[in-house]
Amino acid sequence: MFQDNPLLAQLKQQLHSQTPRAEGVVKATEKGFGFLEVDAQKSYFIPPPQMKKVMHGDRIIAVIHSEKERESAEPEELVEPFLTRFVGKVQGKNDRLAIVPDHPLLKDAIPCRAARGLNHEFKEGDWAVAEMRRHPLKGDRSFYAELTQYITFGDDHFVPWWVTLARHNLEKEAPDGVATEMLDEGLVREDLTALDFVTIDSASTEDMDDALFAKALPDDKLQLIVAIADPTAWIAEGSKLDKAAKIRAFTNYLPGFNIPMLPRELSDDLCSLRANEVRPVLACRMTLSADGTIEDNIEFFAATIESKAKLVYDQVSDWLENTGDWQPESEAIAEQVRLLAQICQRRGEWRHNHALVFKDRPDYRFILGEKGEVLDIVAEPRRIANRIVEEAMIAANICAARVLRDKLGFGIYNVHMGFDPANADALAALLKTHGLHVDAEEVLTLDGFCKLRRELDAQPTGFLDSRIRRFQSFAEISTEPGPHFGLGLEAYATWTSPIRKYGDMINHRLLKAVIKGETATRPQDEITVQMAERRRLNRMAERDVGDWLYARFLKDKAGTDTRFAAEIVDISRGGMRVRLVDNGAIAFIPAPFLHAVRDELVCSQENGTVQIKGETAYKVTDVIDVTIAEVRMETRSIIARPVA
């Protein structure tokens, strides 16, 4: 009798619409219960039985129950699952398999089976890619996944690389394909094979894509020719190799090895500017005045060169600093190094006065054994030879940005707009509390940004600089010319690494159109989206492999008295993140390690400080001594403790 009763249906509808609901993200805990985080301020308790319906990170709608002043959430509807495609470790064998996702907050094994057509017999400990197929909030009885790809066996020494590349769905090896002959591009190539071009790289570099030649001119001027490898002389637009490069967008540099954007035959041989080999190049000739200004007579042209020497960063730096026993092989090469050092000094001073110069941070290099074991991690400071190449490349990229802007009005540009306008007032208020007065409007201009950066660089510590970083916008890749506030430049377009960046290949093709006086087609915006996404994935892959290797490297230091100097990089409610100065590893110091009495401790992300009993005990950018308390291999996390 109640079956089709409209009154009953109406009552049900009313009850449903009157029941309070909330949408948010599930946060799991180690204890079995969880929370529905609605926003930064509001969260609801999810009891353990209800947590069985959801997974950490799921975005859900839940019914909110109130009992005895306590609110709790009952998951009702799945908005967006946290897991779709993931990597994990297989448990069990053959007919009864489960997979544990490789994620610090997902501990439960998910029942699974191998997808049809996947010819691998999975064993305990195997690593696999899986895709979620069932979810309790979708009306299924339980979670269920399908194994779609075998990655490798459990104790493969190279697990960090293979698992990370599979996680981010990135290629494991160089692209297939060969380039048989150079294209006829209708370019007249200037013969510069007699000039003393040199390359400066790491000793192990095979893909040399830039060579330099300098010459003194009258009136204290200097000429610089930057010659860049020319892969677009071999790879036609729209060809199979071009399409593969477009998808990869960059060479992926991971600790220990790289996965090139182009076939190795091209990147490490045909296009590589090897010593004593004739190579086609795209070149830029520029004149620098006595104060380092790039004069207006910038010239881009096609050429052939023959590098006369493969020089190594450290050897060149030692020689210029009058240490070490390396000597240039001839007076002509020595003269090149001296002139290039002069150009570097002039350009460095010009950028210091008219643009912005980054503070030098060391690069950290992993030294690996045959089986991927970490033998050592060394900090490689940026020395004079690194700066010679850097200044030459920045100058060449400024030239390309100008020429593409003035001749075509488009290109592939690196654009950085400084501070987000929405943050300008908050930024000015924060700086004011530290005694720096800036105009909220002015700081959004290139000049205003540069002025502030110089004031911050003059501060005794980097504390204030670290505080304002969160107000900055991100750098973007754009087809429109625009300023790069981070470099303090009106426009910046890279073309100096075409072997390893697809955007630089595009700029090569555009510059060649300018050289030939032809019209060119504006690059499509989709390509900038693909490049930005690939850059993000490659960076995450580099970080993930690094975390794994750092955990391996520091495992035997856990629980010992070995001290490490560590810079505080971030402070949150739960504690502090620090970077070990000698090797670059990131470690976490939990709040209880800072002070035993929780009520006397205030960790403020907002202020970048830790206060104990009202006194500032630690702040971001402080360098403190720590020991390694624990290394958790399953999550690749390093827990440190301050030395008392």
Swiss-Prot record:
Biological role: Involved in mRNA degradation. Hydrolyzes single-stranded polyribonucleotides processively in the 3' to 5' direction.
Name of the featured protein: Exoribonuclease 2
UniProt KW keywords: Cytoplasm, Exonuclease, Hydrolase, Nuclease, RNA-binding
A GO molecular function held by the record: exoribonuclease II activity
SMART domains for the chain: CSP (SM00357), RNB (SM00955)
GO cellular component: cytosol
Family: Belongs to the RNR ribonuclease family. RNase II subfamily.
EC number of this enzyme: 3.1.13.1
InterPro entries: CSD (IPR011129), NA-bd_OB-fold (IPR012340), RNase_B_OB_dom (IPR013223), RNase_II (IPR011804), RNase_II/R (IPR001900), RNase_II/R_CS (IPR022966), RNase_II/RNase_R (IPR004476), RNR_Ribonuclease (IPR050180)
Subcellular location: Cytoplasm
Pfam families recorded: OB_RNB, RNB, S1
One annotated GO biological process: mRNA catabolic process
Keyword check for Methyltransferase: no
Domain RNB: 189-516
Swiss-Prot/TrEMBL catalytic activity: Exonucleolytic cleavage in the 3'- to 5'-direction to yield nucleoside 5'-phosphates
Domain S1 motif residues, every copy: 561-643
UniProt enzyme class: hydrolase
